[in-house]
Structures are given as C-alpha cells and as structure tokens.
C-alpha cells in the first residue's frame, strides 16, 4: 500500500496532508524526479543564502535574527530529510493503531478512547494556530515598513533595493520558502507529541482491559482467552512504540540540539536590542513557538514512560486468584515482560523526558551568557 493512500488515519490527517503538499510523501515513495523535488529545492534554497548573510548586517537585531533563521532552516532541512527516509513506516503505524482501536470495548474504555480522540484534535488545532500566528507575524508586517524591506534578512546575488522587478522576485521567493518551511515544521513538530500521547492512552486502555479480567460472568476459558488477547495487544503496543521510535528519534535529536540555541538568541535580542512593540510581540510569539515545539513532546514522552510502568501492576489488579493454572502461567509471562523499562531516546542518546526540557533551558542560559559576554553586555 502506498503512503499517499493512507490519509484515512484520522489522528494524523492534518500532518499527513501537510507532508503531502510539501512533497514528502512523493519523495518517501522514491519519486525523486518529480515536482516534489523541485519544490524542496526551491523551499530550502534560502538556507545557504541565509548562511551566507549571517553577521553581514550593520543592525545587531538583523544579525541575530539572521542567525536564528539560519539555525532553524538548517534544522528543518535535516528533520525533513530524516522524515522522508522513514515516512513509509506510517503504513504500519496505521495498521497497529487500527488493531488496538478494534479492541476497545465497554463503557469505560469507549469513554477514554473518545476523550483521547478529542484531545488529539485539540492538540492539533493548538499547533495549527501557533504556527499560523508565527507565520503571520513573521511574513506579513514588512508591508507596513516605510522603505522596501523583506521578511528575512538574507544575502542575494543581485541588488533588490533599486529594482522593483528584483524586489518582487526576492519577495515571492522568500514568502514561498516561509509558507512551506512553516508547513513542514508544523508536521514535523506536531506529529511526535500526538503519537506519543496516543501510545500513552492506548497503554492506559490496555491497563483497563487487563484489570477488568475475571470480574464478570465469563467462564475460566473465556477469561484466559481475554488474557491471551491482551498479550497480543501488548505485542502490538510494543511494536507501535518501536516504529514510533524509529520515526521520531533522530529528528527529535536535531530539535534538542537546536532548541537551546534558538531560545538563547531570542531572549538575547528581546532583552538587549528590541525597542519597538511589534518586534517584542514577534519575538515573544517566536519564543512561544519554540516552547510548543519541545514541551509537549517531553511531557508526553514522560507520560509514555509512566504508563508502561503502570502496566506491570495492572496484571495483578485482575481477579487472577480464582483463575485456572494456565491463566496464571500466562499472567506471569505477561508480568515479566512488563518489567522492561520503555525508555524513549532521541538519537538513541537523549531521553525524551521533561528532565531534557529543563536541560535545554539550562543550555540556553549558558549560550545566552556566552553571547552577552561576547558583546560586552553581561555586566
């Protein structure tokens, strides 16, 4: 099955549509000689031009803004390439989620599943609103400037200030890059926390199924079959977690490496250089976007770890005492397997955990003081 045919995954429909528009789905299926490749070249062509213009401006605000945009654009390019290489695994993600959803039964499980779906929709809308606000504040207000200006401080091989045709060409070039990079950034940054929250809730649903075994009017054989089905659900849940790790691990490593630098640059400019109200609003919104990039990811990564830890105790919440010897044998196997700690690592190195989020802010403070000392603003 082609990835472009799997958009019926309701939980990630918006993210997959964003990847489809940006050409990621075509590239992941091997269609390199297509419009998608040309679009990606056009979208990321500003990256070396931004790199060429770093610290080439007289205004320190533009210099630091250019540095932040360059770091962000480079990280977006790296994350985009990593996702393209792994996006075909979304087909298996769809299958595993469908398998687990089909096991939802009973009023308590149905209510929890319904709440999970509603929360996923709210999270997705929050990301959409955040990135839409960042785009509007970043890409639109240049029209209110008294002089000709561009949304991004960037090096161009031609003089766009003295030619209206060159200016319009540079403006369209930058706006296209802004639109598609923010769209790619939205998909890449919103998918990991959404899927981690979904895994955490699927684990909680499995806990409910296991803990309810033996308290109804079913026979011993039926209770044993329910436990065997829960073991199959456990296998599917572990597989879903493994596939998710392979999808988000390295892109999140890039994000953790970049987040501290961007926070430091944003706060540095906001505290020492920004004077106008608009600039303050822009950098505050940019800081909000950076926070939304990472905090939900670390929070739901912590939730996943805690949910899998609770799975071990759910085994003994069932009415196992009155069950058959065969049931208790299966129960012991299930209990032993749940002892394995499920640790999410970005790049197989950094935990996707709230402690890492705190460490990112500590790293941002260190980089902030380094920048302040460099410019003689630390005292």
Swiss-Prot record:
Pfam families: 7tm_6. One of its GO terms (cellular component) is dendrite. Keywords: Cell membrane, Glycoprotein, Membrane, Olfaction, Receptor, Sensory transduction, Transducer, Transmembrane, Transmembrane helix. The chain crosses the membrane at residues 37-57, 65-85, 126-146, 163-183, 254-274, 281-301, 341-361. Glycans are attached at residue 64. Expressed in 10-40 sensory cells in the third antenna segment and in the maxillary palp. Residues 1-36, 86-125, 184-253, 302-340 are cytoplasmic. It is found in: Cell membrane. It is a multi-pass membrane protein. Disulfide bonds: none annotated. InterPro entries: 7tm6_olfct_rcpt. Residues 58-64, 147-162, 275-280, 362-379 are extracellular. GO terms for biological process: detection of chemical stimulus involved in sensory perception of smell; sensory perception of smell; signal transduction. GO terms for molecular function: ionotropic olfactory receptor activity; odorant binding; olfactory receptor activity. Belongs to the insect chemoreceptor superfamily. Heteromeric odorant receptor channel (TC 1.A.69) family. Or2a subfamily. Odorant receptor which mediates acceptance or avoidance behavior, depending on its substrates. The odorant receptor repertoire encodes a large collection of odor stimuli that vary widely in identity, intensity, and duration. May form a complex with Orco to form odorant-sensing units, providing sensitive and prolonged odorant signaling and calcium permeability. The atypical heteromeric and topological design of the odorant receptors appears to be an insect-specific solution for odor recognition, making the OR/Orco complex an attractive target for the development of highly selective insect repellents to disrupt olfactory-mediated host-seeking behaviors of insect disease vectors. Odor-evoked OR currents are independent of known G-protein-coupled second messenger pathways. Interacts with Orco. Complexes exist early in the endomembrane system in olfactory sensory neurons (OSNs), coupling these complexes to the conserved ciliary trafficking pathway. This is Odorant receptor 23a.
């Amino acid at each position: 099955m082609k990835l472009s045919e799997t958009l019926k995954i309701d939980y990630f429909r918006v993210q997959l549509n964003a990847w489809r528009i940006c050409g990621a789905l075509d590239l992941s299926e091997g269609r390199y000689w297509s419009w998608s490749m040309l679009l990606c070249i056009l979208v990321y062509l500003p990256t070396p031009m931004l790199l060429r213009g770093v610290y080439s401006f007289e205004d320190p605000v533009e210099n630091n803004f250019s540095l932040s945009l360059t770091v962000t654009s480079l990280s977006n390019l790296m994350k985009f390439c990593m996702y393209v290489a792994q996006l075909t695994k979304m087909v298996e993600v769809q299958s595993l989620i469908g398998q687990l959803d089909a096991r939802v039964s009973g009023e308590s499980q149905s209510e929890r599943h319904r709440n999970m779906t509603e929360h996923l929709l709210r999270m997705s809308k929050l990301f959409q609103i955040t990135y839409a606000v960042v785009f509007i504040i970043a890409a639109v207000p240049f029209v209110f400037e008294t002089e000709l200006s561009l949304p991004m401080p960037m090096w161009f091989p031609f003089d766009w200030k003295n030619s209206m045709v060159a200016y319009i060409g540079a403006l369209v070039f930058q706006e296209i890059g802004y639109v598609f990079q923010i769209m790619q950034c939205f998909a890449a940054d919103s998918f990991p926390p959404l899927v981690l929250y979904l895994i955490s809730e699927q684990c909680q649903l499995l806990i409910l199924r296991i803990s309810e075994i033996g308290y109804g009017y079913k026979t011993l054989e039926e209770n044993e079959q329910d436990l065997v089905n829960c073991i199959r659900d456990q296998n599917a849940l572990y597989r879903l977690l493994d596939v998710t790790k392979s999808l988000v691990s390295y892109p999140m490593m890039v994000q953790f490496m970049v987040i501290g630098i961007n926070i430091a640059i944003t706060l540095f400019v906001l505290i020492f250089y920004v004077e106008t109200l608009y600039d303050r609003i822009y950098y505050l919104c940019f800081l909000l976007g950076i926070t939304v990039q990472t905090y939900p990811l670390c929070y739901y990564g912590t939730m996943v770890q805690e949910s899998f830890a609770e799975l071990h105790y759910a085994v003994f919440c069932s009415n196992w005492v009155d069950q058959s010897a065969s049931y208790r044998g299966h129960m012991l196997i299930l209990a032993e397997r749940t002892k394995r700690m499920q640790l999410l690592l970005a790049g197989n190195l950094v935990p996707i955990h709230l402690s890492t989020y705190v460490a990112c802010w500590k790293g941002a403070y260190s980089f902030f003081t380094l920048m302040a000392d460099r410019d003689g603003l630390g005292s």
